[in-house]
Amino acid sequence: MSKVRLLDQVRQTIRVLHYSRSTEDAYCYWIRFYIRFHGCHHPIELSAAHVSQFLTFLAVHRNVAAATQNQALNAIVFLYNRVLQQPLEHIDNVIRAKRSRRIPVVFTRSEVQLLFRNLKQPYLLMAGLMYGGGLRVMEMLRLRLKDIDFERKSILVRAGKGNKDRVTILPDNLIENVQHAMDRVAAIHRQDLAEGYGEVQMPYALARKYPNEAQSLHWQFLFATAHRSTDPVSKKEMRHHIFETSIQRAVKTAMHRAGIHKPASCHTFRH
């Protein structure tokens, strides 16, 4: 079995389990790194001791953060448990990366108001949903039209942290702007359909079970991009959601304009 085929297996398994694209990319990166670290030996030939050596190398020689080391461990455990279906024995004798003891950065109410005044749509609505609904940045970006419930004033967050669904509030002051965003997506979708497109990326299992649903309006992303792009999985031209870097850049720019000098990010809206 070649390395290429192994990584293809990893990607396929991740997609069956509905993990995010960022998790897929991260896991493949660490698995590839792990294999190369051990001289390109197939993981089936390696043991828990080899995993310990790799994790220790990351902490001692690469000086990675604890979260980074844990991500590498999760990727390798996933490889053995889910892909190779040969769980490792207990992994011990690992030098753990040191955890930072930083106090979480928090925006004051006045800072939030300043930030909002320096944000334009659709980024203002995005920030509002993260702040008022407690959404993580990728949870917000992956919202579909069907996830918004105006009657109950709620938002369904699909496959959030831990791959779990949950319901959160839709703040009253955001309802009008959410409706405007949905109207925009509906207009874009009509144009896409007229041009012979209109598909959106679907969760793996649903895409196979309901192939026609990919063109349904209710599955379209709330924060759709201005232009279509080629989906890396299906190779079809689709309309994806706005990139994470776009909202991150908008928030950083708004912080600069507002004179807020904190090591903050989109995640700070949740604190």
Predicted features and spans:
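Conserved catalytic core of the tyrosine transesterase superfamily
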Residues: 1-271
